[in-house]
Structure formats: structure tokens, C-alpha cells
Curated annotation (Swiss-Prot):
GO biological process, one term: intracellular zinc ion homeostasis
InterPro entries (alphabetical): ZIP, ZIP4_12_EF-hand, ZIP4_N, ZIP_Transporter
Entry comment on modification after translation: The extracellular N-terminal ectodomain is cleaved when cells are Zn(2+) deficient, N-terminally cleaved SLC39A4 is internalized at a faster rate. Under excess Zn(2+) conditions, SLC39A4 on the cell surface is rapidly endocytosed, ubiquitinated and degraded.
Glycosylation sites: N261
GO molecular function: identical protein binding; metal ion binding; monoatomic cation:bicarbonate symporter activity; zinc ion binding; zinc ion sensor activity; zinc ion sequestering activity; zinc ion transmembrane transporter activity
Record's signal peptide: 1-22
Family listed: Belongs to the ZIP transporter (TC 2.A.5) family.
Gene name of the encoded protein: SLC39A4
Cytoplasmic face residues: 349-359, 424-498, 554-558, 608-617
Stated name of the protein: Zinc transporter ZIP4
Result for mutant: N261Q: Decreases location at cell membrane; retained in the ER
Result when mutating H390A: Does not affect zinc sensing
Length: 647
């Protein structure tokens, strides 16, 4: 009987040994949770080879410093002095996983610990630290970032896992909240060749801000002021009333306070919005609530202060043009803009009707005043002061409305003066003189408004129908345009064509700079900018043509001056494409053009327009209002929606 019992015990022991040694290298997580099976020397050797391939040291490959005996030594109680067994049982998988993670995060230090016999004790210490639920996620994040710093051989195509996935796998395997289960899942992914997507802990962002900009807690007022200056916020960053973001962005950044003990792998990592939300455990579906926004703020501050995202190169723009395409498309767009000057010929299409040309020219003259003043106040002034950048930040266009109030004040006095002249009793001689108001009693036969009016006699003396050619019609309606002996003009009116041409030339040069810079960026930006320039150049050039005609120039002279000033846009275009023009230089050019426009419109065009006499004053008053309000409306819409023109 005794021999039979001994035989049964021997068979049972043999079965157990065979079971322990013959277990296949299953997943470490399933091996840990089942508590059955073991890892033999072959499986451990393969695991150690994988670990050696996944890390690199500061001076190159780390080399293989861990042996199978070191791994088997993890299966004996610390200080037992017993030799390692032939296999590593399932109950020691948690310690093996912790020890492997230590090697992946710090290969040099782990090799020294293994030689000193401290590898197992340090693995137990790591497991003890991660057992706290509050320390598990931050601890894993710290380990993964160290592993990323030491990782070798990773490619962008490798499947990456993050901490939430590791936690879910541990829960699914029946080890919720277990540090050993999470580390075993991590080691399974190491064996399968996965990479790891680590994220910093929420506290890291707060610590970064305080370590870099505060010598103590809480942060002092001076330190907060320095922090706000670096971020470009606060009163000092917006000291001038124009809120010029261009100046704030060009200011040299305040250097970070160097701290040797606060450096981290995360200091140079640029995080996406999804990464930031994941770091704080926020769901993409739920979004960011006001309460969560307060938590996210340190992360955004850290990204701004560290400059991690500023050094990354931008991806190539798909719609960028080649150098030859920039010149081709830019030249075509500028040519179309220059053809606006030729549209002045439209004024001659209605000369078949007596008196119509006079009112057409007066309408376009008022349109020129509205377009030029609107362009200077609503369009160019915001660009000069850098106020157009506010539209990119989602702010309300409040500066535009304030500038519109300036034009409203101008329009109020315009109405007051016109209504005052219309409602008061008029001199009978004004009615007899006709639409031009040429009275023999007014300054030698010419009033101050003579340049902006047509001769009265020609409007009252029609020519026979058989003499109605276009040239005759122009001469009939406005003989001073074709007469080789022009009428006598006042000195200020003789200067008006040159001032209009000079202002147009400077403005068109600046437009060419803008078009060239836009096409250098992309064809979409170039097309949008060209359309915007065309919108405000069309009424502007038509009005200028009318003003030049009324200043005593012939049709040919007015067209030549308009075309000459428009051609400067090509010079600006080629300068921008060839050498490039900075935003600051363009602002100075536009500032000079703004002053020229305001002087021409308010000191020359508007006073002369107000002194026009006509037998139908209310009709002329209506046409002047249509021109003024039309020009201002076009430029107001352009100023409000110019940045929204996209294709």
C-alpha cells in the first residue's frame, strides 16, 4: 500500500512539473489573471531579446545586460537565498512586468540594479507606488514618457496604445485597478511591437508654469505681470488704442527661467487639442464645459510658454503656386484691375440725350467722393492701424462702426449745407445761368464750381440731328473737353488732375503689393485679394474719370492719366513677387495713400461739388446723395466682409 501511495504522489508531481514547464508563452495579462501556467527559459529569453531591441541608450545601443537567470530570480522571495527555479510561475508575472517596464524606462539604471541584485526590490517598490488609484494614471504617464524617450525602432505606421486602452484591457481581463494587470497588458503590447502614446498628467501643466515663472507659491504680482507680458495679454501688451497685434506678435519673447530639476520630455512636445482633452480625461462628445475650461487653462499656458509648437514646420500648402504661375496669375489679375480705368468710356454712352451727361458726371463725381473717402476711412485706415487682424480673432468689427460714425458726421454737415442752400430763397440770376451757374457777375464769368459743371449754353442749344456723331455729342454737352482752347480754370482746379493721378498711383502701387503678396501665399488668397481690390477700384476709377473730365481735361487726357496711374499696380506686383514687401512697409505706403485720398476728396472734390448750380437742384441733391451713400456702402461691405471672401 505504501509503495502504491508513493507511486501516485510521484506521478502527480511529474504531472505538475510537466504542466509548469510545458505551458506555451501565452499573454502575460491572461497568465496573471488565470494564475495558472508559467514562463520557461525560452519564453523569458525571447522577452529579454525584445526588451533589448526596444530601447537605446544615450551613447547608442544599450547591449544585452539582462540574463535569463536574472529574470528567473524575480520568481524567488527577496532575501530567501534560494536558487532560481527552472520556470517563472504566473504569480510572479506582475513583478516581471514591473521589472521590464523599469528596464524600458531606464535601461542603464536597471542594468546596474540587476548586477547589484536590486532589480526585484525596485520592481516591488514600483508596484507598491502604483497600487494607489490616484497614483496609477500619473505614474503610468510618467513611465510611458520615459519609455518614449528611450524607445528605438518605432515607425509612424506602428499601432500605438495609450493609458485608457491599457486600463480597459486590465478591466476586461478581470484585474480592474491592478497595477500588475496594467503593466502586464503594457508588456504584452511591447512583445507585439506596439508603440505607446503617452500624455502628461494634468498637474504637470500647472507645475510647469509655476516652475518657470514663479520662485514661490503663490505667484507674486510681479511674476504674474511677467507671465502676462510673455503671453501678450494685459494692459502693457495693448498699450496703444489701436490694439496692434502685429506689434505684440513681433516682440521678443521673455526667456524661460532655466531649471535643471524641472526638465521633462513633455517640455518639447506639441500637443493637439485631442491630446489636451485626453490628458484631462475629457470626452470629445461631451466637449469642454466652463468648469473643464478652468482645468484646461494650464495646458494652454504651458504650450504657449514652452514654444513647443512654434518650431514645428508647417505642412506644405497644396494650393501654392510656382514662381512662373505667380507672375502669370498676378499679371492677369492686375490687368483686369487696371481696365477699370477704361470703364470711364461708359460715361459717353448717354451723350445722345441732352443734359443727361451732366447728371451722369455729377453722379459719378459724388460716387468718387464716397468711394475715395470710404476707402481712406473704412478700408485703408484699419489696415494702417492693424485693426483688420481683429476679424481673424473672432472679435466684433467695432472699430469699423466707429470709423463709419466719422463718415456719418461728414454726411450730416453735407446734408445741412445742401438743405440750407435749397430751402433758402435763391438768387434769380442762379436760375437764369442754368446748370453750370456761369454768371458774368461771378469772378470774371466763372464760379468756384466751374470745373465740376458743364457749360450751360451747350445744354440749351441742340445741334441738328445729322451732326450727332460721338465727338460732336461730347463737344455739344461739354465743349471744353474737346476745344483746343480750354476755358480759364482756377489754380486749384488746374492742380486737381495731378493730385488725383498722384494719389491713384500711390494707392495702385500699394494694391499691387497686396496682390503680389497674396499670390505668393496661394492662388486662393490671390484671387480673393484681387476681387477685393477690384470691388473698390471700379467705383473709384469711374469717379476719378468724371472728376478729371470736369477739371477741364479731354476724354483722351483723362483716360491716359487714369491708365498711367493704374499701371503702377504692375510695379507693386512685381516688387512684391521679386523681393517681397513686409507688412510694416505696406502699412506705411497705405498711410501715405490715405492722406492723399482725404485731401483730394475733402479739399478739392467735395467743395467743388457743393458749389454746382442747377435748375433742378433737388434732382442734383438726390444724385449727389446716391453717389456718396453708394460709395460708402460698397466700402463698408468690403471692410466688413473682405476677410470672408474665399474660394
Amino acid at each position: 500500500m505504501a509503495s502504491l501511495v508513493s507511486l501516485e504522489l510521484g506521478l502527480l508531481l511529474a504531472v505538475l512539473v510537466v504542466t509548469a514547464t510545458a505551458s506555451p508563452p501565452a499573454g502575460l495579462l491572461s497568465l496573471l489573471t488565470s494564475g495558472q501556467g508559467a514562463l520557461d527559459q525560452e519564453a523569458l529569453g525571447g522577452l529579454l531579446n525584445t526588451l533589448a531591441d526596444r530601447v537605446h541608450c544615450a551613447n547608442g545601443p544599450c547591449g544585452k545586460c539582462l540574463s535569463v537567470e536574472d529574470a528567473l530570480g524575480l520568481g524567488e522571495p527577496e532575501g530567501s537565498g534560494l536558487p532560481p527555479g527552472p520556470v517563472l510561475e504566473a504569480r510572479y508575472v506582475a513583478r516581471l512586468s514591473a521589472a521590464a517596464v523599469l528596464y524600458l524606462s531606464n535601461p542603464e539604471g536597471t542594468c546596474e540594479d540587476a548586477r547589484a541584485g536590486l532589480w526585484a526590490s525596485h520592481a516591488d517598490h514600483l508596484l507598491a507606488l502604483l497600487e494607489s488609484p490616484k497614483a496609477l494614471t500619473p505614474g503610468l504617464s510618467w513611465l510611458l514618457q520615459r519609455m518614449q524617450a528611450r524607445a528605438a525602432g518605432q515607425t509612424p505606421k506602428m499601432a500605438c496604445v495609450d493609458i485608457p486602452q491599457l486600463l480597459e484591457e486590465a478591466v476586461g481581463a478581470g484585474a480592474p485597478g491592478s497595477a500588475g494587470g496594467v503593466l502586464a497588458a503594457l508588456l504584452d503590447h511591447v512583445r507585439s511591437g506596439s508603440c505607446f502614446h503617452a500624455l502628461p498628467s494634468p498637474q504637470y501643466f500647472v507645475d510647469f508654469v509655476f516652475q518657470q515663472h514663479s520662485s514661490e507659491v503663490p505667484m507674486t504680482l510681479a511674476e504674474l505681470s511677467a507671465l502676462m507680458q510673455r503671453l501678450g495679454v494685459g494692459r502693457e501688451a495693448h498699450s496703444d488704442h489701436s490694439h496692434r497685434h502685429r506689434g505684440a506678435s513681433s516682440r521678443d519673447p521673455v526667456p524661460l527661467i532655466s531649471s535643471s530639476n524641472s526638465s521633462s520630455v513633455w517640455d518639447t512636445v506639441c500637443l493637439s487639442a485631442r491630446d489636451v482633452m485626453a490628458a484631462y480625461g475629457l470626452s470629445e462628445q461631451a466637449g469642454v464645459t466652463p468648469e473643464a475650461w478652468a482645468q484646461l487653462s494650464p495646458a494652454l499656458l504651458q504650450q504657449q510658454l514652452s514654444g513647443a509648437c512654434t518650431s514645428q514646420s508647417r505642412p506644405p500648402v497644396q494650393d501654392q503656386l510656382s514662381q512662373s504661375e505667380r507672375y502669370l496669375y498676378g499679371s492677369l489679375a492686375t490687368l483686369l484691375i487696371c481696365l477699370c480705368a477704361v470703364f470711364g468710356l461708359l460715361l459717353l454712352t448717354c451723350t445722345g440725350c441732352r443734359g443727361v451727361t451732366h447728371y451722369i458726371l455729377q453722379t459719378f463725381l459724388s460716387l468718387a467722393v464716397g468711394a475715395v473717402t470710404g476707402d481712406a476711412v473704412l478700408h485703408l485706415t484699419p489696415k494702417v492701424l492693424g485693426l483688420h487682424t481683429h476679424s481673424e480673432e473672432g472679435l466684433s468689427p467695432q472699430p469699423t462702426w466707429r470709423l463709419l460714425a466719422m463718415l456719418a458726421g461728414l454726411y450730416a454737415f453735407f446734408l445741412f449745407e445742401n438743405l440750407f442752400n435749397l430751402l433758402l430763397p435763391r438768387d434769380p440770376e442762379d436760375l437764369e445761368d442754368g446748370p453750370c451757374g456761369h454768371s458774368s457777375h461771378s469772378h470774371g464769368g466763372h464760379s468756384h464750381g466751374v470745373s465740376l459743371q458743364l457749360a450751360p449754353s451747350e445744354l440749351r442749344q441742340p445741334k441738328p440731328p445729322h451732326e450727332g456723331s460721338r465727338a460732336d455729342l461730347v463737344a455739344e454737352e461739354s465743349p471744353e473737353l474737346l476745344n483746343p482752347e480750354p476755358r480759364r480754370l482756377s489754380p486749384e482746379l488746374r492742380l486737381l488732375p495731378y493730385m488725383i493721378t498722384l494719389g491713384d498711383a500711390v494707392h495702385n502701387f500699394a494694391d499691387g503689393l497686396a496682390v503680389g503678396a497674396a499670390f505668393a501665399s496661394s492662388w486662393k488668397t490671390g484671387l480673393a485679394t484681387s476681387l477685393a481690390v477690384f470691388c473698390h477700384e471700379l467705383p473709384h476709377e469711374l469717379g476719378d474719370f468724371a472728376a478729371l473730365l470736369h477739371a477741364g481735361l479731354s476724354v483722351r487726357q483723362a483716360l491716359l492719366l487714369n491708365l498711367a496711374s493704374a499701371l503702377t499696380a504692375f510695379a507693386g506686383l512685381y516688387v512684391a513677387l521679386a523681393v517681397g514687401v513686409s507688412e510694416e512697409s505696406e502699412a506705411w505706403i497705405l498711410a501715405v495713400a490715405t492722406g492723399l485720398f482725404l485731401y483730394v476728396a475733402l479739399c478739392d472734390m467735395l467743395p467743388a461739388m457743393l458749389k454746382v448750380r442747377d435748375p433742378r437742384p433737388w434732382l442734383l441733391f438726390l444724385l449727389h446723395n446716391v453717389g456718396l451713400l453708394g460709395g460708402w456702402t460698397v466700402l463698408l461691405l468690403l471692410s466688413l466682409y473682405e476677410d470672408d471672401i474665399t474660394f
